[in-house]
Amino acid sequence: MAEPIRPSTVLPANRSLFTLTTADGETLVGEVASPIGNSTGAILCLHPLPTAGGMMDSHIYKKAANRLPAMAGVTIIRFNTRGTTSEAGTSTGTYDGGRAEKYDVEAAVNYCFDVLKVQELWVVGWSFGTEIALCHAKDPRIKGLILLSPPLMKVGESDLAFWAEDGRPITALVPEHDDYLKPD
């Protein structure tokens, strides 16, 4: 009989910490959790607002890294944007409201393709992470975006126009009982 999956369940995976350097010289810390066998795809996780406690270990992303490699064969890549701290460490730099974080997203995407050699990369943003996904995760190698509780406070019309014309899939999820957003 299979064991039930509980909130703290950690399933087998290859896990490794990494650091990467952004184009403007910041050092970011992160973790890759990949399946023991073949990977069917990869997810790059962009965390919630760091000034409100968001980080790579935010519960949804931590649970994804703990389970999806074993359950779905998916590689999970999580990292802290500039000035953000988690168990893995602190990324250098200072939170910049989504502006300089473009270098963080670009460095992480390049790491996924150039170092990890992923083939199928999706970007998942949560809250603030949705904003930096829409603004900065435009690399044509990315297959699509999944947006969790997108506030759309810092996303410009040009960013929305880009994605409207681009044609890659975007899925946006706004929970009915979100602490900050209410679906119309």
Task: Locate each region found by the language model.
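Acidic catalytic loop of the alpha/beta-hydrolase fold
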Residues: 153-154, 176-181
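Conserved hydrolase catalytic core segment
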Residues: 135-144
